[in-house]
């Protein structure tokens, strides 16, 4: 996930790693939920993808007309190689199951295994940012405002018209149009996000505490935000939960000074993302069978058990591959 995953190894911001850790854990938890309609998942879905794009935008790289191709190559390496790792792994596993069932390999849908949308959309957002920055000086406030107005307008138009496509690259373009305002927002508010003050005023903390119940209430009023389906519910409610969720996680991360677990997951977030689809899917199937054998039928227990086991496996697998096989994530 671009700079969301790849902050300079020589200079890291602990609270950004914490924010990334919170974000990726929410992704895993959301995938462990048995339905998009349950209250917990509606809350997670209401802001977690905008949060990813915003955090990535914080470390967006500006390029000139002369250096933009080098910037595109670097982003392709850091974002599309993990995408290939994920897709090839899915092809191998699903293809093996397909053949074991006696089916013809020629009928296997290889292209569907490349349909995971987040990393390609983030790649498109980064290209858009580099292109705009090479043409316009986004350091100037007036250009920031105009750029954000245009980006927001395009995003709203697409959502209002329910634009969708079954063609994968076109679908990525549609999603990137909705994601761009959050990505640019991360860049525009970079100084505010990276600044950590030792003075925490009481009323700031009180306002922060109020954000969570507001997000919970609004997310239950709105329909589930399903970005993978290009479904966002009511536009004002989508943007309210997105912005409040971003503020909540960013500001909360500044107050969680010593959280090594979150920092570790933040550093490993690209690896956790790549493997979470497989691990969560495997865990839920195994645990579901065990619960049926025991005569248990409780979604909350299944979700909690799936999440706990998946997090342990994901940490071990992500840690090992990140250190031993960094090329899987475009690191070398």
Predicted stretch roles:
Residues 1-332:
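Alpha-helical transmembrane segments and their immediate juxtamembrane cytosolic regions
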